[in-house]
Structures are given as C-alpha cells and as structure tokens.
Amino acid sequence: MPKAMEGSSMFIVRTAILGIIISTIINAYLMTLPLPVLRKRDYMANYLIKRNNRIDIQNKRECAAFSTAYVLRHFGMEADGEELYTNFPNKMSSGNVYPKGIRRVLRKKGFKTNYYKGNLNTLKYEVSKGTPVIVFIKVHKDRNNLHFVPVVGYDKEYFYLSESLRHLVNCNDDNNSYNRKVPINEFKELWNVKNINMLLYSNTYITVHTIQS
C-alpha cells in the first residue's frame, strides 16, 4: 500500500476511535454509566408482580415519565405520566429523556435507584424481588427508536411488560399488571440497543428501592 494511502487509512481509524471515545464520555455525562452486574443468583422460574395498578397510554415521547409514574403507583403514590413529563429533567431536544432523568425524579420522590448492565438472569432476579424494573429497549428490533418500559414478570417463554405505547399492547391481565408479553428471544433483540454512539447501553435497566429509615 502506498504511504499516502496508508497514512490516510490511519487518519480515518484514529478519527473514528476518537469519535467513539468522545461519544462515550458525553453519554457517560448525560446518561450515567451503567454498573455491570453478571453474578448469577437464584430466582423463581416464573414470577409476576400481582399488584393492581393502572397502565396509561402515552401520546408522544413520554415513555420515561409513564414508566416512572407506573413505578410510583406501584409504591402507592398517585402519579400521572403526562403531568410528570411536563417538568421531567434531562430531556433531549427531541423530547426523549436520558436514563438519568428517571433516576433524578425517583430520587426526588425518596427512592433509591441503580442503573445496571446485566443479562436475562440478573433482570429476572431483580423482577423477582417484587418491584417493576424499567428496561431500556428498542421499540422495534429492526429500528433504532428507543423506549423505556417496566418489566413486571417473566416465565420460561415470555417477559411481561406494562406497555405505554398503544400499538405494542397485545394482551391484558386482570390485575392490570401487564398488557404486553414478549417472547424471550425477541426481548433479547429489543434489549440490544448498542450502536456506534452507544456501545455500553445494551441490556441495561433501572431498579428502584425504598430507602430504609
């Protein structure tokens, strides 16, 4: 390879690497870095959070607020996703919200949150504790539109979600715990949100806990 072409190729590679590094730093500031957790723990083979709740349907890009409101109602606090979204922090110009925004709102309400990067086993373990877990997934597996939604149960075939996007609702539950079930293999594809600008955010989720007094 001529030296001029070799130099040009190296410049392109270095520029690409620098772009990835800068993007990762910006995302770490705007979104916070998820904490890796891979340790396998015991959990029930099937689990569903059976608590009467209300599943509201969003109209625009308010999934972060609607997911947060669902979790707040789980803890007995009346919350409306649309109202919550009005003053929701960490919004992008598009109206979408960074994960940090969800955590800020929940902490302000008196809860402890963690942002994890795990796998199917760690997600099931967290759900089996009895509190909805907010996952960061794609709306459709072949597109890059991203979405927050609470996971409220699982079994050997499906994950059960409290879905705020009307066109994704595909079932119903007597307790209003869930209105969407996703086959596990499909969920894995939706959960893989990784792209060149977001290398660290596949398989991430937010857990919520009450603060012990």
Residue ranges and their predicted role:
Residues 1-8:
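N-terminal Lys/Arg-rich, disordered targeting/topogenic segments
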Residues 13-14, 28-35, 92, 128, ...:
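Noncatalytic regulatory segments and standalone regulatory/sensor domains
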Residues 69-78, 87, 91, 105-112, ...:
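Structured segments of extracytoplasmic/periplasmic soluble domains
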Residues 112-170:
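Active-site-adjacent substructure of cysteine-protease-like catalytic cores
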